[in-house]
Amino acid sequence: MSYRVIVDSCGELTPQMKESGIFKTASLSMEVDGFHIPDDETFDQADFLKRVAASEECPKSSCPSPERYMELYKCDVDRVYAVTLSGELSGSYNSALLGEKLYKEEDGEEKIHVFNSRSASVGETLIGRKIQECEEVGMDFEQVVETVEAYIEEQHTYFVLENLDTLRKNGRLTGLKSLVVSALNIKPVMGSTPEGTICQLDKSRGMKKALAKMAEHVAKDAVKPEEKILAIAHCNCPERAEAVRKLILEKVKVKDSFIVDTAGISSMYANDGGIIVVL
């Protein structure tokens, strides 16, 4: 193995990615009522959602330290790639860059590139898989970086949540008009901007209609979908995720698709019942 891919823990690793030995996770952490929860293999989604529901305080998150990234860069490979949450939404990207600087000051010799996903969750997962795909066909380091950066440019992220409280209270919806959603059961269809911030794309009354609207946006925005993998992450709602996949695949043909349950950070922001789609 001559390369490593580091993905911060907002990006869910599929079973195949975990088994490959190529991927390593840079864990973020969460806090609910002073209780510290690492976003790693010990994360218990059911317990976490229960704690959040019982708390009057908004859960908080913190990103991996530069030193943690530096530790992950130290390995017996020639090329290291890191994939982080959008730099507009988290400090993880800047931590990864600073970790690279610290590592190289210690005479680290590996080639390192940090990808700003401008996304989250399965957006990061797909970028990690794209890196692996490029490496497996024999691209050199510079070709991998160029190809994956171009892939990120074409990627779109969408989500519909039961509530936006955690995103709003943690300042991730800055600049958006206040959304009156709960009283009228209005569900906004949210998406990513090219810069990696969050925008509102649409809205509908009720979750079912909002998910259908989201599927329409996915199909409309898709760039060369027959060459792409559709990824869906759900927070404790597998049937809803399958229904969304069916809705999208009725409208657009893709290379492949997969569904994962949200890990810690994605569970924190998506909340119980949330759906995230990336194509």
Where are these regions (language model features)?
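Repeat-mediated protein-protein interaction surfaces in helical alpha-solenoids
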Residues: D33, D107-I112
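Active-site cofactor/cluster-binding pocket
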Residues: P64-V80, T84-D107
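Mixed-charge interfacial surface used for oligomerization/domain docking
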Residues: Y3-R4, C10-K24, L28-S29, L89-S92, ...
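Local beta-strand N-terminus motif with an aromatic residue
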Residues: S2-Y3, V77
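A glycine-rich beta-strand to alpha-helix segment
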Residues: T84, H113-V114
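N-terminal glycine-rich anion-binding loop in soluble enzyme alpha/beta folds
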Residues: Y3-C63, R68
